[in-house]
Amino acid sequence: MFLLHEYDIFWAFLLISSVIPILAFLISGVLAPTREGPEKLSSYESGIEPIGDAWVQFRIRYYMFALVFVVFDVETVFLYPWAMSFDVLGVSVFLEALIFVLILIVGSVYAWRKGALEWS
């Protein structure tokens, strides 16, 4: 028989971590002042009134840098726990991590050759 009482701490943590943000939003909605005026409805940018049109188009180059950053950030997230338990896991996990790193190296070489890492 499956014992559910072993998961009591998990369910309590899940309930508490769900209730706290909901209560924070509800309390801030009740206690926050709701006065709207021209100052609240105006745009604000770094302490000065914005000049010009608000629709600014970014070059695709910025998105490529962000995408490459996310790929290497995810790589770090996956490799850190592996590195911390490297001595316990064994050779098969080492080979899997090596394949993972090789795939990322191939991807970074591809991005480099396509010019995604060139700033100018």
Swiss-Prot record:
Sample GO molecular function, one term:
quinone binding
Specify the protein name. Answer: NAD(P)H-quinone oxidoreductase subunit 3, chloroplastic
Presence of the UniProt keyword Phosphoprotein in the record: no
Instruction: Tell me the organism.
Output: Acorus calamus var. americanus (American sweet flag)
Query: Which reaction is catalysed here?
Result: a plastoquinone + NADH + (n+1) H(+)(in) = a plastoquinol + NAD(+) + n H(+)(out); a plastoquinone + NADPH + (n+1) H(+)(in) = a plastoquinol + NADP(+) + n H(+)(out)
UniProt lists the gene as ndhC
Q: Which UniProt keywords are given for this protein, alphabetically ordered?
A: Chloroplast, Membrane, NAD, NADP, Plastid, Plastoquinone, Quinone, Thylakoid, Translocase, Transmembrane, Transmembrane helix, Transport
Task: Please describe the quaternary structure of this protein.
Answer: NDH is composed of at least 16 different subunits, 5 of which are encoded in the nucleus.
Q: Which InterPro entries match?
A: NAD(P)H_OxRDtase_bac/plastid (IPR023043), NADH_UbQ/plastoQ_OxRdtase_su3 (IPR000440), NDAH_ubi_oxred_su3_sf (IPR038430)
In this UniProt entry, which cysteines form S-S bonds? Answer: none
Q: Name one GO cellular component term.
A: chloroplast thylakoid membrane
Lineage of the source organism? Eukaryota, Viridiplantae, Streptophyta, Embryophyta, Tracheophyta
What is the membrane topology here? Answer: Multi-pass membrane protein
Q: Which family does it belong to?
A: Belongs to the complex I subunit 3 family.
The record's annotation in Gene3D superfamilies points to:
NADH:ubiquinone/plastoquinone oxidoreductase, chain 3
Provide the top EC class: translocase
Q: Name one GO biological process term.
A: photosynthesis, light reaction
Q: What does this protein do?
A: NDH shuttles electrons from NAD(P)H:plastoquinone, via FMN and iron-sulfur (Fe-S) centers, to quinones in the photosynthetic chain and possibly in a chloroplast respiratory chain. The immediate electron acceptor for the enzyme in this species is believed to be plastoquinone. Couples the redox reaction to proton translocation, and thus conserves the redox energy in a proton gradient.
